[in-house]
Amino acid sequence: MFIYEKKLQFPVKIATPNPKLAAFIISQYGGPDGELGASMRYLSQRYSMPFAEAKGLLTDIGTEELGHMEMVAAIVHQLTRNLSDEDVRNNSAFAPYFVDHTTGVYPTAASGFPWTAGSIQSTGDPIADLTEDLAADGAMAHGQRPINHNKFPDSTFRAE
């Protein structure tokens, strides 16, 4: 069903770890409006879609969201790699995450609340599901906030 290419859609190269920024970006991975929820939403809703074209589109979008999830995971990983104890102690935003997950990439919101399927919906009603998709995509705009409000002087990645 899926073909996996062993490369990211866009390269992620972050030279300097930044655990404070990682504490914000992690919401794009497993927060209520993050990529994990988006991919599960689309891939679940496709089964009850009565039109082949819409079913195919939901499959394509859900698969694309999995790719986005992988890029966010790479960003979080690179922002937290090789942290010293001092780095963690000096970043109160990242310290609670570190207690439970060290530098593992775990699907959670910046608040620390773990990802849950309770933040997505698949009703079986095509109109309700597509309406929910539109609302969720609007909410995903929040994910640009950490990127737009932070400078990445030692990094290169495209956020599209």
Where are these regions (language model features)?
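Non-heme di-metal
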Residues: 1-160
